[in-house]
Structures are given as structure tokens and as C-alpha cells.
Amino acid sequence: MGKRVLAGGVFDILHPGHVAFLEEARKIAGKNGELVVVVARDETVRRLKRTPIVPEEQRVRMVSALKPVDRAILGHPRDFSITLKTVKPDVVVLGPDQDIDEKEVERWAERAGVDCEVRRIEKYERCPLDSTIKIVKRVIELWKRGELRV
């Protein structure tokens, strides 16, 4: 029997790291399980990280088109426990580079009345452009060298 797995992130510029994370989350869900991906709202990204490059509606559309994903939703802008209460996952999966602490997710789940396991994916195959910031830096580098044309 499969599990309902919740994975989340910004997914601003999709890259192989995102795909590897979601493939691992899918494995945890199992063949008959469900992978629900919560995409951070623009407001949340601005508050916690930076200004998003790609608007939330486009990010959730791109994530929903990925093969491992059964359903992609926008998260609650201020309270992750509301998202947990809505989705009711069996497992919440965190990526290796996500700054959130597992214990904090457990507290949110408890507040939401959701009994779920929290797992962190420790590693996945790394590649040179496996983060949004690395991609942005590469674009800037190519632009400065005159190798990109608009």
C-alpha cells in the first residue's frame, strides 16, 4: 500500500536537483502512493529567501507537469500547518539543502492534528547546475562574456 507524501519547495528555476528530490520522494510514496508537492507562494519566497524569478502560478504549473508528481498545490502564505491539515500526508519529505528543521515540521504537524513521519533525503546525484543560484550565476557569467544574446 502506498503513502501520501508531501514535498515542498520554491522550484523557481527547475533544475536536476529538483527532479532528483522529487524522484526520491516518489520512491517513498510507492507505486500506489501519492506525491503532493507544495510550491511556495511568491509572498513566502520574498519573506524567507529573495524575490522569486518565476511567478507562483507558473512554478506550480511546471511542477505539476513533472513525471514523479501526482498533484502540485500552492502553499499557505503564512502557516504550513494549514497545508499539512489540508493534505494530510503520511510522510513529509525534506530535501538535503532545505533549511527547515525536522522537529519544526513535526511541531507544525502536531498543531495541525496530522500524524505523519518527517524524513530528510540526505543526498542525491549532484551536477554543476543543481541550484537556482548556480544557474543565475552561470547566466550572469555567460552574459558578461558576451555569449548570450537577447
UniProtKB/Swiss-Prot annotation:
Belongs to the archaeal FAD synthase family. One of its GO terms (molecular function) is FMN adenylyltransferase activity. InterPro entries: Archaeal_FAD_synthase (IPR050385), Cyt_trans-like (IPR004821), FAD_synth_RibL (IPR024902), Rossmann-like_a/b/a_fold (IPR014729). Its EC number is 2.7.7.2. ATP binds at residues 10-11, 15-18, 97, 124. Homodimer. It catalyses: FMN + ATP + H(+) = FAD + diphosphate. Pathway: Cofactor biosynthesis; FAD biosynthesis; FAD from FMN: step 1/1. It comes from the Archaea. Keywords: ATP-binding, FAD, Flavoprotein, FMN, Nucleotide-binding, Nucleotidyltransferase, Transferase. Catalyzes the transfer of the AMP portion of ATP to flavin mononucleotide (FMN) to produce flavin adenine dinucleotide (FAD) coenzyme. Its cofactor is a divalent metal cation. Transmembrane segments: none annotated. GO terms for biological process: FAD biosynthetic process; FMN metabolic process. CDD domains: cytidylyltransferase. PANTHER family: FAD SYNTHASE. This is FAD synthase. The gene is ribL.
